[in-house]
Amino acid sequence: MNPVLIAVPAAAALSGAAVSYAAFYPRSQIFGTTICRTVSAQQLALTFDDGPNPAITPRLLDLLDQFNARATFFVIGRFVRECQALTKEIAARGHLLANHTQTHPNLFWLGPNAIGNEMRQCQEALQEAVGNPAKYFRPPFGLRNPWVISTARELAMQTVLWTLLPGDWREKPVEWLTPRMQPIAENAQNAARRNSGDILCVHDGAHRQLGGDRSRTLGALEYWLPRWRDLGLKFVTIAEAVHTPAT
């Protein structure tokens, strides 16, 4: 067989694999710097996407308060505009607000202008609600292309993904979701042998419309928060997670 006929498809396959890795794999740095871990194994960054959600977010805030847990909320701009009081409450209770675009599109298929518009509109919504824009950004579905991280950087935002995505958006019972957060406990038990900690990505809202039942997420967190605390984990915002703790 002509070696060219072999080489061309092979090169195309390798190229496709590289793009897939860059776009989908949370730890990939190919398209630019992405935060995907905390700087200390004793830290756990709790992050919540797709809110604010009047049906769930207030209950979540109360739960976090019980454990003196600070978290990062990656909010959708159009929901921020509908829920300005709730957005202000998130910030007032010590949590960090971050950018999750205006409408939650798949940015992988968009060009730089559309990507920039999505990010800027969410920044404007946050500016209007709480008086300042976000410093951190998470792309919807975690998908990136060459313009996503560079555009976020132009808007003075760092891009954040995760170490654990347990799939709480799926229509599964809490008994299915809870064990999928077990890796955090296992990592905490091995903290002495690790030099970084976990970023958990779960959801307090649903991106298609305002609201959504995320009670399974609350149920799983009710189980895990006291156990993670007892393992010595400190619940931190992303801003705290990227700075080395004082000794």
Predicted regions and their residues:
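Alpha-helix N-cap and loop-to-helix initiation/capping positions
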Residues: L110-N117, W176-P179, G212-A220
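Active-site beta->alpha N-cap acidic-glycine motif
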Residues: A23-A114, E118, A125, N132-A134, ...
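A short acidic, helix-capping loop that chelates divalent metal ions and anchors anionic groups
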Residues: P105-L110, D168-K172, H207-G211
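Catalytic grooves of carbohydrate-active enzymes
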Residues: A185-A239
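A cross-domain feature marking catalytic cores of carbohydrate-active enzymes
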Residues: F48-D50, F73-G77, N99-T101, P139-F141, ...
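Hydrophobic alpha-helical topogenic segments used for membrane insertion/localization
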Residues: M1-F24
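Alpha-helical scaffolding segments of alpha/beta enzyme cores, especially the outer helices
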Residues: R59-D62, A85-A92, N117, Q121-E124, ...
